[in-house]
Amino acid sequence: MKTLLLTLVVVTIVCLDLGYTLTCLICPEKYCNKVHTCLNGEKICFKKYDQRKLLGKGYIRGCADTCPKLQNRDVIFCCSTDKCNL
């Protein structure tokens, strides 16, 4: 009986989803493919850029716990699925 109980406990632990970690893109270029695993608690991917610099400079991508605030002429896109901040 103890063996059966122990087996059930082990199977339960192995099968549990012990947590999900978001992955976001991080790089300063307009076109990006560098993937980063977010820290625990960071559940937002974002892409932020200055609308005056549309030719690819001034991009910031990353993970955050909340969507960053707008400043000056920034454009910010926030999302919550893997690599959604393309």
From Swiss-Prot:
Signal peptide stretch: 1-21
Subcellular location, record wording: Secreted
Role: Binds with low affinity to muscular (alpha-1-beta-1-delta-epsilon/CHRNA1-CHRNB1-CHRND-CHRNE) and very low affinity to neuronal (alpha-7/CHRNA7) nicotinic acetylcholine receptor (nAChR).
Protein's name according to its UniProt entry: Probable weak neurotoxin NNAM3
Family: Belongs to the three-finger toxin family. Ancestral subfamily. Orphan group II sub-subfamily.
Tissue and organ distribution: Expressed by the venom gland.
Disulfide bonds: 24-45, 27-32, 38-63, 67-78, 79-84
Pfam families to which the protein is assigned, alphabetical: Toxin_cobra-type
Keywords: Acetylcholine receptor inhibiting toxin, Disulfide bond, Ion channel impairing toxin, Neurotoxin, Postsynaptic neurotoxin, Secreted, Signal, Toxin
InterPro entries: Snake_3FTx, Snake_toxin-like_sf, Snake_toxin_con_site, Toxin_cobra-type
Molecular function per GO: acetylcholine receptor inhibitor activity; ion channel regulator activity; toxin activity
Membrane spanning residue stretches: none
Annotated source species: Naja atra (Chinese cobra)
Any one of the GO CC terms: extracellular region
